[in-house]
């Protein structure tokens, strides 16, 4: 093994000098022992004269010039396979759940190529989530990618936890949850939620939390993806959840600044599109198995044109947009049915009936949106009878789009509801056709299927 020595330490950036004829490759893992602690560095740049610039995959506290560094001769490798299920790991694949070591038969490099074109496989099979607004307005497809876009505090993590809970119980495959730069408290809550739902034995958890150095947060998404790729290549249908893809971008911006690159628009790294592409192109389905990915995307200052969410948009099949305005009305999940889109909302994929009902719902809500200004100025009494009916049905639809969640039971006191796709379509179809025009709109708030509106107090 080649050895070198540290010549400079600036925060998370460490420069290491090696003999000029055996300089480590970019992305190689280096190991430095500091007392009892071992720290992994990842080579990011070769500066010439045998010097490489590295990012520390951990706290660089205590490092000093002159310490010996060993080149491991390969990129960071993490355990993969069934031994990772029900375990919590860090960016290096080390267990952080105090349940002992992970006895994996294989370790894979976190830097891998995307599958070749001839290996790819497309699926048109709809993935039922049990959440009405998603299943109707922005359906997800098996092997597709969906993004949950929203500002701070509108419910991205709660929606993601509900999706994991519903799909993991209904769907027999494995799930990988990757916490990228999120709160430790949320990671802890998520673990206990999965344990209480009895789905922990089908989930691998990989965390790189908010308090960790930028190198950990930047690479942890690749660690989770590598574990998911192994399950896919074994022939499984895998669910990959990433919370939050914005923190991945932010960690990349921190690393870029530390490496001395010139920032681009709004202070992001100049390599933003490339880094996003490297991650997203690997999240795909092959003829062996599928990876279905659901990613939470924080939207800074609720601005969807910010480079970070805007770069993510182009990689997704479905965009689920969470709205602060809808959350302020007390309608949860606060998903905007007019802003949210899906490539699968096509009669050839979802069927003509589903497509017609979704378009009917969109049409009524869009008309209600247009009438709001008139109502605010002149009052609802000045509207024509047809428009009054549109407003009445739109308000019922708006309330029927709300739904009690299983993962929020402890906060709301309402039992969670799973609504099948067929029940969702027939419920909205009945509202559009005027079957429930005689019922007050309050009856449609926070219920599961449409039948509950008849019995609700």
Swiss-Prot record:
GO CC terms, sorted: plasma membrane; proton-transporting ATP synthase complex
Topology relative to the membrane: Peripheral membrane protein
Pfam families reported for this sequence: ATP-synt_ab (PF00006), ATP-synt_ab_N (PF02874), ATP-synt_VA_C (PF22919)
PROSITE patterns: ATPASE_ALPHA_BETA (PS00152)
Highest rank taxon of the organism: Bacteria
Chief localization: membrane
Subcellular location: Cell membrane
Residues noted as binding ATP in the record, renumbered to the chain: 150-157
Chain's role: Produces ATP from ADP in the presence of a proton gradient across the membrane. The catalytic sites are hosted primarily by the beta subunits.
Entries under PANTHER family matching the protein: ATP SYNTHASE, ATP SYNTHASE SUBUNIT BETA, MITOCHONDRIAL
Summary of subunit composition and partner proteins: F-type ATPases have 2 components, CF(1) - the catalytic core - and CF(0) - the membrane proton channel. CF(1) has five subunits: alpha(3), beta(3), gamma(1), delta(1), epsilon(1). CF(0) has three main subunits: a(1), b(2) and c(9-12). The alpha and beta chains form an alternating ring which encloses part of the gamma chain. CF(1) is attached to CF(0) by a central stalk formed by the gamma and epsilon chains, while a peripheral stalk is formed by the delta and b chains.
UniProt-recorded name of the protein: ATP synthase subunit beta
Protein's gene: atpD
């Amino acid at each position: 093994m080649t050895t070198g020595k540290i010549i400079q330490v600036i925060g998370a950036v460490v420069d290491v000098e090696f003999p000029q004829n055996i300089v480590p490759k970019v992305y190689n893992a280096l190991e430095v022992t500091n007392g009892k602690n071992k720290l992994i560095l990842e080579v990011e740049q070769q500066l010439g004269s045998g010097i490489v610039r590295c990012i520390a995959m951990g706290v660089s506290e205590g490092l000093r010039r002159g310490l010996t560094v060993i080149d491991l001769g390969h990129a960071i490798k993490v355990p993969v396979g069934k031994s990772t299920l029900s375990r919590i790991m860090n960016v290096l694949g080390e267990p952080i759940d105090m349940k002992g070591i992970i006895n994996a038969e294989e370790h894979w490099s976190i830097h891998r190529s995307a599958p070749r074109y001839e290996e790819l496989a497309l699926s048109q099979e709809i993935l039922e989530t049990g959440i009405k607004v998603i299943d109707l307005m922005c359906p997800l497809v098996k092997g597709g990618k969906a993004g949950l876009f929203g500002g701070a505090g509108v419910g991205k993590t709660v929606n993601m936890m509900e999706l994991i809970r519903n799909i993991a119980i209904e769907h027999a495959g494995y799930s990988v949850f990757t916490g990228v730069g999120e709160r430790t408290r949320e990671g802890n809550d998520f673990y206990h939620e999965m344990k209480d739902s009895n789905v922990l034995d089908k989930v691998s958890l990989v965390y790189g939390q908010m308090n960790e150095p930028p190198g950990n947060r930047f690479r942890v998404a690749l660690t989770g993806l590598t574990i998911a790729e192994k399950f896919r290549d074994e022939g499984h249908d895998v669910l990959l959840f990433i919370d939050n893809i914005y923190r991945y971008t932010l960690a990349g911006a921190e690393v870029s600044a530390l490496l001395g690159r010139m920032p681009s628009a709004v202070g992001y790294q100049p390599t933003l599109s490339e880094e996003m592409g490297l991650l997203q192109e690997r999240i795909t389905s092959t003829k062996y198995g599928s990876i279905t990915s659901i990613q939470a995307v924080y939207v800074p200052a609720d601005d969807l044109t910010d480079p970070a969410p805007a770069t993510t948009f182009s990689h997704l099949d479905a965009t689920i947009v969470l709205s602060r305005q809808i959350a302020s009305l007390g309608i949860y999940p606060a998903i905007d049915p007019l802003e949210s889109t899906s490539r699968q909302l096509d009669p050839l994929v979802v069927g003509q009936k589903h497509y017609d009902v979704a378009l009917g719902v969109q049409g009524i809500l869009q008309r209600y949106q247009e009438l709001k200004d008139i109502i605010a100025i002149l009052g609802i009494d000045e509207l024509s009878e047809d428009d009054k009916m549109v407003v009445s049905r739109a308000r019922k639809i708006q309330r029927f789009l709300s739904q009690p969640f299983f993962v929020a039971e402890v906060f709301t006191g309402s039992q969670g509801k799973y609504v099948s796709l067929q029940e969702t379509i027939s419920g909205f179809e009945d509202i559009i056709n005027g079957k429930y025009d005689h019922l007050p709109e309050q009856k449609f708030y926070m219920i599961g299927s449409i039948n509950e509106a008849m019995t609700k107090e």
